[in-house]
Amino acid sequence: MSDVKGKSTSGRGLTPKQEKFCQLYIELGNASEAYRQSYDCSKMTTEVINVKASELLNKNGKITVRVEELRQAHQQRHNLTLDNIIADLQEYRDICMGRKPLTITTVVKNAQEGTAQSVNTECFVFEPTGANKALELLGKHLGMFTNKVDVTTDGKPLPTVINVTFSDEPA
């Protein structure tokens, strides 16, 4: 995979350490920890590690491309898409709010005849905690619960006003 100089021969132009960083970043989701496990950080402070990991992740185009490739492969491998997650949350919300029936399967065994039969029963459930969580996650996805404070007027910052009063009367 790599030659004597430590350059990748995989066609991506990444060194083995850079490739390891990319793999660990996808696995761990933490750039600093991926950097610690990929490079010698014995003489570095936590702040230096954080800066170097951030620079490696954000300023190196080859690493950015590789991380995106790995992320897409990871999503395909786990069949995770935003649409699937949202659809599942909506279905969960509907079940928890009693809009959609929940199917419960019960196995009825007959010991004398030696048979087992499954019986499906549909019921409506109201689970407010689950419905609340599903609605909260859907709302967060839509950006409904962000705390934004607009401190501008017509795109300009508000002027700072300081009122000072002087009085000759003793307090």
Curated annotation (Swiss-Prot):
- Source domain of life is Bacteria
What biological-process GO terms show up in the record? Answer: chromosome organization
What is the protein's name according to its record? Uncharacterized protein HI_1411
Under the heading InterPro entries, the entry gives: Terminase_Gp1_N_sf (IPR038713), Terminase_ssu (IPR005335)
